């Protein structure tokens, strides 16, 4: 085998590897495009929550904000539907205590649960509404990754701010179902 032949084979191998990497990257970006499209087609997210672009939500109790994309809010909605909706349909709470996820109720908790940090903390270690004792937790503290917990908290906060009837008995006033699939 001559030196030129080895060099050509090496160049072909490099081109193949680069081409394969390009295909993989293109495939990955396609998945993101699908998530982007799903988030922007979801009526509950775009209409009821008013999310058509990035939204700022309270990050902590001192006024810092955290920006969430429509895709993150949509991911939080999907997590809510698959993990929380049985007990918290439409932001209500069906088992005891019957304290809903309405914004006023989140703000009235001790400590307030009206920001991303406090909701994630509550998901990890639930406390009674008055903050005096640990409450029943249906999941282990590590049941969800931090970024997923933040997306879930973002969905809950945005719904408590914008969704008509969220956390109230007037859920029938909501025009679009929580579980309506995107068209």
From Swiss-Prot:
Protein's name in the database: Photosystem II extrinsic protein V
Leader sequence segment: 1-31
GO CC annotation: photosystem II; plasma membrane
Keywords: Cell inner membrane, Cell membrane, Electron transport, Heme, Iron, Membrane, Metal-binding, Photosynthesis, Photosystem II, Signal, Transport
Family in the record: Belongs to the cytochrome c family. PsbV subfamily.
Subcellular localization: Cell inner membrane
Disulfide pattern: none
GO biological process: photosynthesis; respiratory electron transport chain
Swiss-Prot/TrEMBL cofactor(s): heme c
UniProt-annotated binding residues for heme c: 84, 87-88, 138
Pfam families: Cytochrom_C550
Record function comment: Probably one of the extrinsic, lumenal subunits of photosystem II (PSII). PSII is a light-driven water plastoquinone oxidoreductase, using light energy to abstract electrons from H(2)O, generating a proton gradient subsequently used for ATP formation. The extrinsic proteins stabilize the structure of photosystem II oxygen-evolving complex (OEC), the ion environment of oxygen evolution and protect the OEC against heat-induced inactivation. Low-potential cytochrome c that plays a role in the OEC of PSII.
Membrane topology: Peripheral membrane protein
The keyword Heme is annotated on this UniProt entry: yes
Molecular function as annotated in GO: electron transfer activity; heme binding; iron ion binding
Subunit structure: PSII is composed of 1 copy each of membrane proteins PsbA, PsbB, PsbC, PsbD, PsbE, PsbF, PsbH, PsbI, PsbJ, PsbK, PsbL, PsbM, PsbT, PsbX, Psb30/Ycf12, peripheral proteins PsbO, CyanoQ (PsbQ), PsbU, PsbV and a large number of cofactors. It forms dimeric complexes.
Entry note: cofactor: Binds 1 heme c group covalently per subunit.
Organism ancestry: Bacteria, Bacillati, Cyanobacteriota, Cyanophyceae, Gloeobacterales
NCBIfam families: PS_II_psbV2
């Amino acid at each position: 085998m001559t030196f030129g032949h080895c060099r050509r084979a090496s160049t072909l191998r490099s081109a193949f590897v680069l081409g394969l990497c390009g295909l993989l990257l293109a495939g990955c970006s396609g998945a993101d495009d699908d998530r982007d499209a799903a988030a922007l087609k979801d009526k509950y997210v775009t209409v009821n929550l008013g999310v058509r672009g990035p939204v700022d939500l309270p990050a902590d109790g001192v006024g810092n904000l955290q920006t969430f994309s429509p895709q993150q809010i949509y991911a939080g909605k999907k997590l809510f539907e698959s993990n929380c909706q049985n007990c918290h349909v439409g932001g209500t709470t069906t088992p005891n205590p019957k304290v809903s996820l309405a914004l006023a109720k989140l703000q009235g908790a001790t400590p307030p649960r009206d920001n991303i940090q406090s909701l994630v903390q509550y998901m990890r270690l639930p406390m009674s509404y008055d903050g005096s004792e640990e409450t029943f937790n249906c999941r282990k503290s590590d049941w969800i990754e931090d970024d997923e917990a933040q997306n879930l908290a973002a969905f809950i906060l945005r719904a408590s701010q914008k969704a008509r009837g969220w956390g109230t008995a007037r859920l029938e006033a909501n025009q679009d179902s929580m579980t309506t699939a995107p068209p």
